[in-house]
Amino acid sequence: METPAETYREDGFTLARWQFADGPELLAMVNGSLEHLGAWMIWASGGYTAEDCAEFLRTTRQNWASGETHDFAIRVDGSIAGAVGVMAREGGVEIGYWLAREFVGRGLITRAVTLLTEEAFRLGAGYVEIKHDERNVRSGAVPARLGFTVVRTEPAGKPLAPSCTGTNRVWRLLRKPCSAPAGS
């Protein structure tokens, strides 16, 4: 898959590649939502330090350069609301996401995933997958709403966040075949 743009602007939100300057705001936002995020995200379950934040931003920069992952801050009115990432997989991509508590229920993730799914297909991905713990109903509602199909369950990586069961549900959406060229 080709490299996506660094910024996407939509009505009501912006997706922007993470920058080192985002560190202080990201740190404050994650720490303000630790209970909410830590239930499902192992990286937030034991607290989130300035070093954790700096390491995340370093890793996102390296992964972007290698094409392994393209991570974006979700911004609403200029403020960080959460994150969405597009991870390269053989023949397709996986999309992961999270939001700060105060931004849940606004349709931001559904709209961000819609945008990035369309972009992934435009850039050559054959499929998009979304994985979530089988108990995380909110995360599962996104691919269900967007027409993805459950293709399997699989063991989650260890260690697990406190609310996780250890079983991930995997959803997939295939790129629609291109229409036949005119005159064929």
Report the location of each language-model feature.
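A short helix-loop-beta-strand connector motif used in the catalytic cores of GNAT acetyltransferases and
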Residues: 44-47, 58-73
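Short, intrinsically disordered/low-complexity patches at protein termini
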Residues: 48-51, 60-62, 105, 162-164
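Generic recognition of well-ordered alpha-helical segments
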Residues: 55-59, 115-118
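Generic, well-ordered alpha-helical segments
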Residues: 18, 29, 45-52, 66
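Acyl-donor (CoA/ACP) binding surface of acyl/acetyltransferases
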Residues: 1-25, 29-36, 71-184
